[in-house]
């Protein structure tokens, strides 16, 4: 993500400067400001909301359909989202033929950039089948519902580590996950339920976040209680996607600023409607470096 950095320019009137002007006669009697000359302190505070994540949502309608519902073999969900360098993607979709299993990347998500190079193509190898640990497992597609549990029955784990005695198709046999990039920070994620898959897929909850965050789950820990249980048990992506959306939004810091004392008729930093002076404002407004203007 390219952070938008804003320079803060303000003017300050000091007692000493006014005295100098009065002593040298540069101010006429009528020009003396009313009130007692003095110093001013200006505080600039960044009051924007400090969101935990960058962007989030839910995709509820399969491609080519008119209503929300699962994607059956041969169908897919497509999601578009924005991301920049340093961002990662996490998502979850229910393995429909189960009590509480879901597909998704590892808890810390998938890195969307390697340096300046966006991740594109088939990323199915980065996806695993996970056991939410909120119900006792039964044989896939058996139709047996797990007993209603008030607490997780175990920690959330990769299904390969659960050893419940049941056999599941490999991820690559059931789904294909791809990423495309349009060159303007827009990615397209496609989650396809393959022909011959042993399970439908639920609507998808997704979130774009920073490195070091585990927004949906942490492997080896119990479910957070933020909506993943609903998704993994019933395919309802609404509670989890709503929760993630509430914590997501654009966050910008405020860059270091510069200030200058000047006459009313002077425009030392910029003139509206004219080109940049070439004296450092470009660096301040683009990367937040005020040294060019200051020097």
Residue map of PLM features:
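Bacterial N-terminal signal peptides
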Residues: 2-8
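Intrinsic-disorder/low-complexity peptide segments enriched for small residues
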Residues: 3, 16, 20, 25, ...
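Bacterial Sec-dependent N-terminal signal peptides
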Residues: 10-34
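Structured domain cores in non-transmembrane regions
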Residues: 29-116, 186, 195-295
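Exposed beta-sheet edge/beta-hairpin loop segments within beta-rich domains
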Residues: 32-33, 70-83, 136-183
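C2-type phospholipid-binding modules
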Residues: 97-153
């Amino acid at each position: 993500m390219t952070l938008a950095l804003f320079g803060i320019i303000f003017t300050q009137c000091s007692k000493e400067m006014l005295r100098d002007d009065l002593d040298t006669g540069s101010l006429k009697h009528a020009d003396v400001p009313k009130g007692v000359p003095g110093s001013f302190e200006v505080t600039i505070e960044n009051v924007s909301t400090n969101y935990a994540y960058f962007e989030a949502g839910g995709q509820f309608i399969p491609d080519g359909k008119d209503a929300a519902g699962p994607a059956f073999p041969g169908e897919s969900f497509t999601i578009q989202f924005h991301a920049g360098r340093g961002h990662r993607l996490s998502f979850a979709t229910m393995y429909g033929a189960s009590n509480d299993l879901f597909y998704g990347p590892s808890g810390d998500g998938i890195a969307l950039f390697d340096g300046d190079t966006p991740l594109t193509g088939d990323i199915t190898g980065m996806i695993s089948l996970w056991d939410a640990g909120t119900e006792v497992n039964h044989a896939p597609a058996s139709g047996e519902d797990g007993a209603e549990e008030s607490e997780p029955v175990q920690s959330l784990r990769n299904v390969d580590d659960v050893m419940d005695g049941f056999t599941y198709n490999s991820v690559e046999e059931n789904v294909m996950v791809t990423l495309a990039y349009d060159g303007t920070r827009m990615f397209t994620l496609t989650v396809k339920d393959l022909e011959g898959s042993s399970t439908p897929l639920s609507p998808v909850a997704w979130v774009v976040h920073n490195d070091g965050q585990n927004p949906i789950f942490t492997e080896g820990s119990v479910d957070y209680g933020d909506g993943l249980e609903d998704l993994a048990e019933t395919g309802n992506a609404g509670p989890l996607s709503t929760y993630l959306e509430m914590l997501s939004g654009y966050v910008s810091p405020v860059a270091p600023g510069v200030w200058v004392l000047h006459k009313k008729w002077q425009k030392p930093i910029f003139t509206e409607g004219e080109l940049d002076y070439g004296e450092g404002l470009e660096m301040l407004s683009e990367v937040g470096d005020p040294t060019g203007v200051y020097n």
